[in-house]
Amino acid sequence: MIISNEIKSLLNSHTIGHLATTSNQNIPRVIPICFIELDSHIYSILDKKPKSIPVNLLTRVKNIESNPSVSFIIDYYDDDWKSLWYIQVNGTAQLLYKPISQVVNKLIHKYPNYENMDIENQPIIKISPTSINKWGERFT
């Protein structure tokens, strides 16, 4: 699925998104993530920020391995409710264990703190969109 330029622009201007995964026992999990859009896919790296367990045991990793259907959302809130909007990307996630320099470089450009982290060899979540829902007056 091709992501429109309008949606790409909004994705590229947002620094936080939320990823929803579901376990094989249908237990949902939503977490905030750093992300980029590249070639109509969403990417997030399993970086080296402090974690209480090894990366391969993270709930999102286990959920993706057992159920690759995910949902990803960015949104905008304002006290003027006519300005509210969201973009929800539903898709299939996969874990990539080989570095993709274009993804790593774009993540470092978007999130300068990654310059001080060794992220080149970290696993990457790749979301391939199957549908996109958007809501808000800006889209009408």
What are these regions (language model features)?
Residues 2, 77-140:
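Charged, gly/pro-rich active-site loop segments
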Residues 7, 56-63, 100-103, 107:
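Amphipathic alpha-helical interface surfaces
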Residues 11-23, 69-74:
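A short, Trp-centered hydrophobic/proline-enriched beta-strand micro-motif
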Residues 16-36:
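Active-site and channel-lining beta-strand-loop segments
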Residues 32-35, 61-62, 91:
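Hydrophobic/aromatic beta-strand elements that line small-molecule binding cavities or substrate pockets
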Residues 38-77:
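A short mixed-secondary-structure module that forms the rim of ligand-binding clefts
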